[in-house]
Amino acid sequence: MDNVPIIRTVSGLRHFLRCFPGNLNTGASPSSTVIGQIGLVPTMGALHAGHLSLIQRARQENQCVIVSIFVNPLQFAAHEDLTEYPQTLNQDQALCQEQGVNTIFAPSTDTLLADAPLTQVIPPASLTEYLCGPHRPDHFTGVATIVLKLLNIVQPTRAYFGQKDAQQLAIIQRLVQDFNLDVTIVPCKLIRDATGLALSSRNQYLNAQEAQQATILHHSLQAARHTFQGGSCDRNSVLATVAQTLAKGPQVEVEYIDLVDPVTLQPLEQITTQGLVAIAARVGSARLIDNMLLDARLPILAIDGPAGAGKSTVTRRCAQAIGLQYLDTGAMYRAVAWLALDQQVEVSDPFAIADLVEDCQIELKPHADPQQQPQVWVNHQEVTQAIRTPDVTALVSAVAAQPPVREALVKQQQRLGRQGGLIAEGRDIGTNVFPDAGLKIFLTASIEERARRRQQDLKNQNLPPQTQSELEDLIASRDQQDSQREFAPLRKAYDAVEINTDGMTIEQVITRITTLYQERFPDRA
């Protein structure tokens, strides 16, 4: 087998991308995990298991995977380890080959930085005034500049970054937001070795004794989590625990410990939703960073699957059984349809509907009776009953078919999910709306089983019957339509638990999901 190609020029990479075959939705099945066309994994080389975990996820989620290898001089200060940074291109190429990478983009410094002085990207000061920022003053400007160049050159659908570099991740997410870049930044979990040491290319600088000493960083974070889980959510208690543990490592020279908001990177006095405990320390010649997210929120449960798999009924019942808020996404689309009628906006006009939905605020409040529909407000006007009228019902499908509506409502759903404690169902909840959901379920059933259930529903509702064969054809057609639609196709999240409900009662399905939830979150059950 030929080695994965190494492309060193921008023109060469663009030629490769033009020639790469494939359409995202051609031949896709509902259980496919492919949700992007091009996945980019930016690295500085010296690949290790942490990098490989990013590549493996990119391989599961994209048709084409590109790994960039560039030791970026802009992010190194004069006294730092640019010249010593490990470069192992042949070994990296072999690892990429094993993981099914399509190509490596390994430009030279002259290729990316030929026209110095370079136009640079300066992140907001609020994102660099704490953690590593004061200790590495120009580092994040260098990172943001090169990442923006890579995103522009590769034009990926999705780009993968590790959560070990939490400050870098927050800055890149903000960069994508501020520059309106059409790419999804995918945070990937921090990978540790058997001792708990966070994997890093700079771990190569550690001798055996130093590597053992370095594990105390993780031990201190575990101690912080224990303190947090014991009910101490204030800054002083959490950081004192970290400091006390780190003090037991005589070879560990602490640069900083801090507790910050994981998005704004501003210091926290109290963890009310999420807090990031971050450490930087020197062990021997190696500068090491590590972090841990402390989450006070209830988890989010995402349920996806094809039509007719029983998602709606199961999701509502699970919400009641577990104690999560059911996020009625259908009510949100009804709210937009009501607003379009109220404002006399033509729903077939994508520009008018985009303007309408961009400025509207939808609020949902659970009914005291979990069997009842939630209360709904649009722009502070209560519309719970108004969105259930026949006129609104007749308009919902046309409204939901507009990509601007879906895009805007996904943002609002994500806003509602910031406090956690939600359960939602759909076709892209776990892949698009809540990709960081604590538990993802892909609920499915055979076409034959779904047709049988539909036949029974028709009978129970005294509706005209259809044959099993007719219903199977309709369901197969719906599956194909949902999995091959251009915008938000039905996909199984790479980390979803698949439950085939053939032969299962609703009660059995609910028991299976609630058991999974209790096993994953024993302290929240």
Curated annotation (Swiss-Prot):
Keywords: ATP-binding, Cytoplasm, Kinase, Ligase, Multifunctional enzyme, Nucleotide-binding, Pantothenate biosynthesis, Transferase
Organism field: Acaryochloris marina (strain MBIC 11017)
Chemical reaction(s) catalysed: (R)-pantoate + beta-alanine + ATP = (R)-pantothenate + AMP + diphosphate + H(+); CMP + ATP = CDP + ADP; dCMP + ATP = dCDP + ADP
Binding-site list for beta-alanine: Q75
EC number of this enzyme: 6.3.2.1, 2.7.4.25
One of the protein's GO biological processes: nucleobase-containing small molecule interconversion
Amino-acid positions noted as binding ATP in the UniProt annotation, renumbered to this chain: 44-51, 162-165, 191, 199-202
Pfam families per the UniProt record, alphabetical: Cytidylate_kin (PF02224), Pantoate_ligase (PF02569)
This protein's name: Bifunctional pantoate ligase/cytidylate kinase
Major localisation: cytoplasm
Ranges where the record places region Pantoate--beta-alanine ligase: 1-292
GO molecular function (one): ATP binding
A single cellular component GO annotation: cytosol
Pathway: Cofactor biosynthesis; (R)-pantothenate biosynthesis; (R)-pantothenate from (R)-pantoate and beta-alanine: step 1/1
Its job: Catalyzes the condensation of pantoate with beta-alanine in an ATP-dependent reaction via a pantoyl-adenylate intermediate. Catalyzes the transfer of a phosphate group from ATP to either CMP or dCMP to form CDP or dCDP and ADP, respectively.
Entry keyword annotation includes Iron-sulfur: no
Residues binding (R)-pantoate: Q75, Q168
